[in-house]
Amino acid sequence: MADYWKSQPKKFCDYCKCWIADNRPSIDFHERGKNHKENVAKRISEIRKKSMEKAKEEENMSKEFAAMEEAAMKAYQEDLKRLGIKPDDVGPSSTLNKTQSITAEGKEKKEKKEKKEKKEKKKKTREGTSESPKTEPKEWVQGLSPEGYTYYYNTKTGESQWEKPKGFQGNSKTSHTGSVWVEGVSEDGHTYYYNTQTGVSTWEKPDGFVSSSNDNSQRGKHSEEADSRASESDSEQEDSESEGQSPGTNLKRKGENDEESEKEKSPKAKKLSPYGKWREVKWQEVKWQEEAVDKEKIALASKEASSDESKTDTYGKWKAIKNEEEEEPDEKVDLELPSTEGDSALPPVLDVPEDATVIFKEKTVTSLGDLTEGVPTFKKREFENGKSRNLRQRLDDQ
């Protein structure tokens, strides 16, 4: 681990405007000091002065506002005297009258809301009684067998029968059964019908099938008939209420109107299906789509083949590179550069014959010296007064 220098934490004193070591002993020592205590006393006195000044300013402002209000009330009373209006009418009694009027209006609004809620509850109870007889026939559901015959199935008891039960409303179901069959056109131009649930296709028109154009016209007719019947039922209800007819007839009429409204709502629910509308498909469009798919497959296969070929060569294919010197079309410009003939001159070449012989001087040593002189000796140093020269000596002056 490398050594590093860590600074001690410090604390800033707001009263003295100085930095102190951030530990308990140094802080206590600083707070016990005379200078710190004097600074704290000064700060407290300054805060007290400021608070006193603010209180005085508020008192002065309140006095000024009170004087302004008094002057305004005096001017207001003088204006009322000029106009001939009594000042009592504009006093606290007038405010009480206003509050009483506001409370009265609030009570009236509450009463109106309660009346509306009661009327809505009555309408809901009547609708519930009118819808009760309709729940019975909804137990039966219409269906188609694989052979194309219609049968009726009871959702509660689980019974199935070929005969139509009593009170069964098949008109609301016909739109659903018709939507199961889809109309199409073959290559020859003949129309055929395809069942989306069973997958059966027939050349003959199935029972209950309605084309898109006929369906729209029938819906328009149904809506017009429903509007006319609704207007007739409204007029009959008004007559019955005036004459005091029995409530049973009104309930029957409401039930019929509700049935018609359900018939009208059924095609709307069909429109809001999550899979969208059915569309007629022609064989030419199917062929074009198949051809486009085949072309895409061929293109993908060619791409895969090319990728395989490229994978075999890790470095890619070899390419021939041509070195073509680009000739500058512009004319050469004389830049008046210094001549380099002297610099580029070659050094002189010496003509040395190949057969020339080199002569070397020879020196011979006859003897290595006289060995009879004796053993070699070393000279000894001479000392002055028995002392070596390297030692520091005292001067005579001292």
Swiss-Prot record:
A zinc finger (Matrin-type) spans 11-42. Residues 233-242, 324-333 have a biased composition (Acidic residues). Component of the spliceosome B complex. Associated with U2 snRNPs. Binds splicing factors SNRPB, SNRPC and SF1. It is found in: Nucleus; Nucleus speckle. The keyword Repeat applies. Residues 112-125 have a biased composition (Basic residues). The keyword Translocase does not apply. Residues 134-167, 175-208 form the WW domain. The lineage of its organism: Eukaryota, Metazoa, Chordata, Craniata, Vertebrata. This is WW domain-binding protein 4. Residues 84-182, 200-274, 300-350, 379-398 are annotated as: Disordered. One of its GO terms (molecular function) is zinc ion binding. Disulfide bonds: none annotated. GO terms for cellular component: nuclear speck; nucleus; U2-type precatalytic spliceosome. Involved in pre-mRNA splicing as a component of the spliceosome. May play a role in cross-intron bridging of U1 and U2 snRNPs in the mammalian A complex. PANTHER family: WW DOMAIN BINDING PROTEIN 4, WW DOMAIN-BINDING PROTEIN 4. Residues 126-139, 221-232, 305-316 have a biased composition (Basic and acidic residues). Keywords: Metal-binding, mRNA processing, mRNA splicing, Nucleus, Repeat, Spliceosome, Zinc, Zinc-finger. Gene3D superfamilies: 2.20.70.10, Classic Zinc Finger. Residues 92-103, 169-178 have a biased composition (Polar residues). PROSITE patterns: WW_DOMAIN_1 (PS01159), WW_DOMAIN_2 (PS50020), ZF_MATRIN (PS50171).
